[in-house]
């Protein structure tokens, strides 16, 4: 098993390029990050919708976003995402025609239950959803919804209560409603939902590097002076 080791001296060297405010912000945000929940986007046609979901995940502290790209390429719009993509781990499944299955298998291997967001007859209402298990929320294409593969392998179905004439929500709006509800419950629960110390250290190191302009040259200078 690969173990990522952080060069503490290099980190200290790089931290000198950051303000105290930025370092404090990183540490505060990390305290609210979680992998207890994750979001999976399956064949989202409109890139701006996918980008808005990425931004929503950052806002509510969900660290990982998965993208299944059987039909459409999911390119994040920087204008819509507002830079949030920089702070998240994004996993794209686009190499094989069976990307949905490969992604679902990877999620199950990581211990996630698969929850399809769809107005299914057996769907659980959002307010009644049990947050105790690690959950991957699958959001499907704007028109078709989640695929049959997802429906057949889902551990459950989730729907947002609606009482109007319209029976669907924009995918980014749906993601925001779901994540606001489940993360609020999560943070007031006794569930061990936070990242491990090692996970926080790895992300902090990554964020520090992403913040510094020409970081590769700065690292090179550091190693040349050893």
What would you call each of these model-derived segments?
Residues 16-122, 183-184, 191, 195, ...:
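RNA substrate-binding interface of SAM-dependent RNA methyltransferases
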Residues 81-86, 132-135, 177:
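Short, hinge-like loop/turn segments at secondary-structure boundaries
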Residues 1-4:
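Short, Lys/Arg-enriched N-terminal segments with co-localized hydrophobic residues
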Residues 73-78, 144-150:
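Short, glycine/polar-rich helix-capping loops at beta-to-alpha or helix-loop-helix junctions
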Residues 151-196:
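Structured adenosyl-cofactor binding patch, chiefly the S-adenosyl-L-methionine
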Residues 68-69, 94, 141, 158-165:
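Short beta->alpha connector loops at strand-helix junctions that form conserved
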Residues 53, 130-131, 150:
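Structural alpha-helical scaffold elements that stabilize or flank donor/cofactor-binding regions
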């Amino acid at each position: 098993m690969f173990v990522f080791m952080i060069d503490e001296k290099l980190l200290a060297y790089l931290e000198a390029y950051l303000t105290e405010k930025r370092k404090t912000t990183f540490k505060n945000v990390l305290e609210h990050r979680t992998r207890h929940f994750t979001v999976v986007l399956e064949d989202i046609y409109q890139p701006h919708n996918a980008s808005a979901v990425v931004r929503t995940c950052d806002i509510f502290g969900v660290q990982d976003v998965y993208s299944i790209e059987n039909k459409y390429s999911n390119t994040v719009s920087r204008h819509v995402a507002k830079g949030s993509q920089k702070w998240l781990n994004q996993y794209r499944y686009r190499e094989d025609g069976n990307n949905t299955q490969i992604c679902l298998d990877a999620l199950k291997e990581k211990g996630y239950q698969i929850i399809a967001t769809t107005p299914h007859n057996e769907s659980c209402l959002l307010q009644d959803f049990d947050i105790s298990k690690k959950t991957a929320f699958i959001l499907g294409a704007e028109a078709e919804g989640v695929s049959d593969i997802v429906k057949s392998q889902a551990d459950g179905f989730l729907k947002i209560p609606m009482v109007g004439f319209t029976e669907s929500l924009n995918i980014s709006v749906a993601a925001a409603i779901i994540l606001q509800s489940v993360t609020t419950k999560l943070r007031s629960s006794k569930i061990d939902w936070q990242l491990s110390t090692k996970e926080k250290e790895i992300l902090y190191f990554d964020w520090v590097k992403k913040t510094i302009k020409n970081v590769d040259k700065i690292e090179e200078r550091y190693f040349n002076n050893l």
